[in-house]
Regions:
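Mature, well-folded catalytic/scaffold domains that follow N-terminal targeting or propeptide regions
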Residues: 1-213
């Protein structure tokens, strides 16, 4: 039930959907076994993600959850694969920065388009097809919100291609937990999306890893 609430209501850049989906995958791999305390913790984690976002997460929106968001220029996705392919191939992001006293996660919000779409694809593979359409609609909203741009500056362009399939990637000294989180999603999508070019995908997203400390 908590996952359904997260699916139908965008919050914290899709974290509740991501947490819930990973939990379902673990339960599936464990043949339904899950200690009560872990189940309680997962539900709390999803509930926190649903209830505790800050309303001005996206630049240009004072209360994005209660404002109308025009998604007319975002494609209508029929499947999670379509959505995920769009997300990995359309990454135009700016460095995170403070504007008038508020810190905005510009590139952070865009990388979560990828992790959110990957979670929806995983949900489909787990058999939860009833959750896909509302999930895709909330992802469209997230994509639109993440396209907000700072008043100054230019999009960040990655300087090198960083590859999570290479050992050197895992030797990088990075504290940001999104480093491995994004690597998981990108690795999963490269393996599960047909008709994409691995080098193109990695070039599109490597800037995210460069911006992590």
């Amino acid at each position: 039930n908590q996952l359904e609430e997260n699916i139908h209501n965008l919050s914290t850049a899709g974290h509740g959907v991501i947490y819930g989906t990973l939990a379902l995958k673990a339960i599936n791999q464990l043949n339904g076994w899950l200690p009560k305390e872990i189940k309680t913790g997962i539900i709390k984690l999803q509930k926190d993600a649903y209830e505790n976002d800050f309303p001005n997460r996206y630049f240009g929106y004072k209360d994005y959850q209660n404002e109308r968001v025009d998604v007319s220029n975002i494609p209508q996705f029929n499947t999670p694969k379509e959505a995920a392919k769009y997300c990995v191939l359309n990454q135009k992001y700016f460095e995170n920065q403070e504007i008038e006293g508020t810190h905005y996660f510009f590139h952070g919000n865009q990388l979560h388009d990828i992790t959110h779409s990957q979670a929806l694809l995983m949900l489909e593979k787990l058999g939860y097809k009833n959750l896909l359409q509302p999930g895709l609609e909330q992802l469209r909203k997230q994509i639109k919100l993440g396209q907000s741009q700072p008043p100054k500056g230019t999009p960040y362009i990655g300087k090198t291609q960083i590859n999570p399939f290479h050992m050197q990637f895992w030797e990088r000294k990075v504290n940001d937990e999104h480093h491995n989180k994004l690597a998981y999603s990108i690795s999963y999508l490269i393996k599960n999306l047909e008709g994409i070019n691995e080098s193109e995908v990695l070039s599109n997203v490597s800037g995210h890893w460069e911006l992590m400390n």
